[in-house]
Every structure is written in structure tokens, then in C-alpha cells.
Amino acid sequence: MHRIVSPSGATISYDRSGRGPALVLVHGAFSDHHTNWEFVRPIFENQFTVYAIARRGRGETDATVAHSLKDEASDVAALIESIGERVFLLGHSYGAHAALAATAKIPHRVRKLVLYEPAWPTILSKRIAARMESLALAGDWESFAITFFHDGLFVPLKDLAELRASNLWAPIVADAPASFRDLRALARHDFRPEHFRGLTVPVMLQIGTESPRHLYATDALAAALPDAWIVSLPGQAHEGMTTAPQMYAESVSRFLLEDVALAA
């Protein structure tokens, strides 16, 4: 892995692969720089030089404890600054918040931005948050993950059972301690869509047609951002890059490269 040092002093690691214009990927919670993009990264590598950042507690990145979402936005911005060219930026879930905040810090370095379902900081009710806190402190990471997916994201029991039986589940549970810190940082995050009214970078806001729309800030951001529109992913929920990778990658590439195609 490659490494940089963030303004906070934390060591941040990332993978680089592929060839083409720079595309920075910022993963969400309950995943890392590998698992979040496992099925779409090989597709992206045919069109882009892919920089997959490992957020705090993943890969060889420092596992800090009391960091904020703004700290992680600074990590993303530091990676972008190190690349030496303007980049395309894609963030998923928690990673979408970090990507958006990073873009606001250095808008001149971001060509276009893709945000897939950034959750409201209040996504978890006080009751569910308290239960997850107790499970985390007890080290019961499997129950912690189950509670998040079923009671937080409202994943149906049948779908959750299928997820737990798949080879995707073990990495999800393994990431739970880092995700616990993510959820704490998100809950403290002062997120107000209207703060981004002056951000003129073109933004595509992705949302799955099967996702509980009220959990995500997609519509509020579409109303606040001056150059943004929503693209729905038919039949998908929160993990479209895993459940429909070809469709997902085509949606992203079409948006990012449309001006390049017109210029050609």
C-alpha cells in the first residue's frame, strides 16, 4: 500500500491501480478499501487510475479513536492534493460525507463528485444507538452488525439471513470495531445541506429504489447543491456496487466521462 500523512499527523494508506484519469474511492462503514469496491474496481481500472483510500482503522491507516468526520475529510483532501491532478471523487455512505466535506475544502481539485446514500447523522434512534453502544462495549461485534443492518438500515430478516450466510459477512463483522468509531463520528457531525449551497462542482447523487429514502440526505442535498441531480439505481438498496456492479459502474462512468466523450 501507498501512504501519506494527514494534517492531523495520522498515517493514511491507499491502493493505486488502473490507468486513466484519477478516480478516488472513499468507502463506507462495515467495509474497507477492498470489500466496498471488490466487484466494481476491476471495471473502473479499465477507465481510470483508481485510488482506493483505506479510512481510519483499515488497511495500514492509523486506527485513531476520537477522530471526527472532518478529520477523515482532511485525510481524503490530503490524498487528493498528493495526486497532482484534478480528480473524480466517489464516496459511499459514511464515505460520501467524507468525500463531500473534502470537496468543500478543495473544490478546485475535484472535477466531479459522486455521492451514494450519505446517511443523516440521526440515522439511528437513541434506543438503537444505546443498544449498539452496549454491544460494542461487550465486544459482541456480530450482534452489533446484525442490529445495525436490521434495526438501522431496515434490512429484512430474509435478506439479512442470506447476507450472514454469504462470504461477505465475515469481513463485515471484522470491520465492526472501526465502524463503531465511524458511527460515533457521524452522530457528532454537524451536517447541514445548506452549508454546501456555494459548491459548484457537478454532483451525481445515487440512491437505490429499494432503500428507505428517509434515512439518507440525498433529496436535501439535491435541493441545496447548485449543480446536482439524483440518479436512481433500479432494484438496488444500499450496496448497489456489490449487488449490481456492472450497472453501478456504468452509471458512474457515464456521469464522470460524459464531457470527455463530447470533447472527443
What are these regions (language model features)?
Residues 199, 205-207:
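Short beta-strand/loop motif that positions the catalytic acidic residue
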